[in-house]
Amino acid sequence: MKKIQKINLAVFLAFIVFTIPLSYVLGSDFMGRQEKPWHMQGSVHEDSLSQEYLGKYKILDKVPVTLQVERSKEKRVLILIDAWGVPFDEKKMAKEFAIFKDVPHEYAIHKRLKNVTKHAELVEFRTDSTESIVAIEKLSRLDSLLMNSDYKTVALTINDSKEGSEESLRNVLNDIAELMKKFPDVQFIVQGAHRPILGTPETRREYYAHWVPVVIGNF
């Protein structure tokens, strides 16, 4: 191999050695600045509740709510509401909680590990073998069931709000509040199953990823 060829080869190899790491660094930086698809994006501080929430509400950890709330009545109703989450805007949360202001209540925020309704049902509706429990599908059945049965615990998942409609959610909350007033001797534990996930990406990003509201009524 001629001397000039050796020099050219050495220059070429040096160029390759230099450009490969540089292209990796620049490429990584470029990719890091690209906007990810909505399902890969995390909300800002999505798992860190604001000081406003921490100072105003009782915070329940990832242990099932039903194990953290003492039974205060002979009968108890456990309600999961699909797509009821904790918004970054605390004032919005306060308006939803205020629907229950006319019944004895306690508000709380609960850590929910997964955004899946079935997971919430498995976690919250587990019961001791000595305790009778019945699961129903419609809120309209609850009235007659509480009046005409001896069940100690009734469990219900409400899907009316699963599409993320705020109007549907408020209607559901109002109906539950009216039942609390009608049955003051029944303890109600109402909580979100997970944040809204079927709406627009913008709507999803308005909520904490793994926190849900809890209302304990007639406690």
Regions found by a protein language model. Give the residues of each.
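Solvent-exposed soluble domains appended to multi-pass membrane proteins
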Residues: 64-219
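Transmembrane and membrane-interface helices of multi-pass
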Residues: 1-39
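Generic signature of intrinsically disordered, low-complexity segments enriched in small/polar residues
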Residues: 15-18, 27, 33, 41, ...
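Membrane-interface segments at or immediately adjacent to transmembrane helices
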Residues: 24-94
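Intrinsic disorder/low-complexity signature
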Residues: 5, 26, 36, 44, ...
